[in-house]
Amino acid sequence: MEKKNCNPKETSSQKASDKNHLTLKNSLLKDIDFYLVTDSGLSKKGTLSDVKESVEAGCKIVQYREKCKSTGEMIDEAAEIKKICSGRAIFLINDRIDVALVVDADGVHIGQDDMPIETARKILGANKIIGLTVHNADEAIEAEKSGADYVGLGSIFDTFTKKDAGKGIGPASIREVRNAIKISVVAIGGINKENCRSVIENGADSLVAISAVVCSDDVKKETREFIDIIREIKGTGSSK
């Protein structure tokens, strides 16, 4: 029978290591301004082009969300996105933990009805980033307790990008969630340059604006403008 390791020093060392990883991830996620989520159905130039332009503009996190391609096609495209993001942006994959494992992505983003965070963490390990979609403070608190590194809160405003998003919960809900948890809050849903100020002013660490960016003829320009608005509100300077 295999003996259990009961060495208290080793246990303390592991706990310290896990805490350091958590602190590092929290720091990285708090520094993010604009969060790109891909959408091949809305994109004018294609997913790879969108990622390249957005990262070049200063985007520091990319979530690859693809619902229409085969697993093989997703793996190939994800591998290319990873190359673009390497050393410049955090690379996450929506839902598909299997694809994330194959390409060694930085983590995943999952929904309320997907695999439990605890299970995803066992599969991915302590060093990977796991984000969870939430709709209110109660879900956000539970996400933090379960080990999520950040929450994606929405839909903040009414949106046509995701048909099952429901009615917008309003920017005031961000403040409620921000006050309830310590991990990073990413706002998503119906956000554009006209309403994004209220999103950041209410406490979001970063935001997602899908159609406002990927439907554009100039993804780089749109990304940079979002980053500049966010940094102006946060007081952290320009992307230029």
Swiss-Prot record:
Which EC number(s) does the record attach to this protein?
2.5.1.3
- Identify which top EC class this enzyme belongs to: transferase
Gene3D superfamilies in the cross-refs:
Aldolase class I
A single MF term (Gene Ontology): magnesium ion binding
Q: Name one Pfam family in it.
A: TMP-TENI
Q: Which cofactor does it need?
A: Mg(2+)
**The organism's place on the tree of life at top rank:** Archaea
Any one of the GO CC terms: cytoplasm
Q: Which residues bind 4-amino-2-methyl-5-(diphosphooxymethyl)pyrimidine?
A: 63-67, 94, 133, 162
**Which pathway does the protein contribute to?**
Cofactor biosynthesis; thiamine diphosphate biosynthesis; thiamine phosphate from 4-amino-2-methyl-5-diphosphomethylpyrimidine and 4-methyl-5-(2-phosphoethyl)-thiazole: step 1/1
Annotated Mg(2+) binding sites: 95, 114
Task: Relay the cofactor remark from the entry.
Answer: Binds 1 Mg(2+) ion per subunit.
Q: What InterPro entries does the annotation carry?
A: Aldolase_TIM, ThiamineP_synth_sf, ThiamineP_synth_TenI, TMP_synthase
List the catalysed reactions: 2-[(2R,5Z)-2-carboxy-4-methylthiazol-5(2H)-ylidene]ethyl phosphate + 4-amino-2-methyl-5-(diphosphooxymethyl)pyrimidine + 2 H(+) = thiamine phosphate + CO2 + diphosphate; 2-(2-carboxy-4-methylthiazol-5-yl)ethyl phosphate + 4-amino-2-methyl-5-(diphosphooxymethyl)pyrimidine + 2 H(+) = thiamine phosphate + CO2 + diphosphate; 4-methyl-5-(2-phosphooxyethyl)-thiazole + 4-amino-2-methyl-5-(diphosphooxymethyl)pyrimidine + H(+) = thiamine phosphate + diphosphate
User: What keywords appear on the UniProt entry?
Assistant: Magnesium, Metal-binding, Thiamine biosynthesis, Transferase
A Gene Ontology biological process annotation?
Answer: thiamine biosynthetic process
**Which SUPFAM superfamilies does this one have?**
Thiamin phosphate synthase
Its family remark reads:
Belongs to the thiamine-phosphate synthase family.
State the protein's purpose: Condenses 4-methyl-5-(beta-hydroxyethyl)thiazole monophosphate (THZ-P) and 2-methyl-4-amino-5-hydroxymethyl pyrimidine pyrophosphate (HMP-PP) to form thiamine monophosphate (TMP).
Protein's name in the database: Thiamine-phosphate synthase
Q: Which organism is it from?
A: Methanosarcina mazei (strain ATCC BAA-159 / DSM 3647 / Goe1 / Go1 / JCM 11833 / OCM 88)
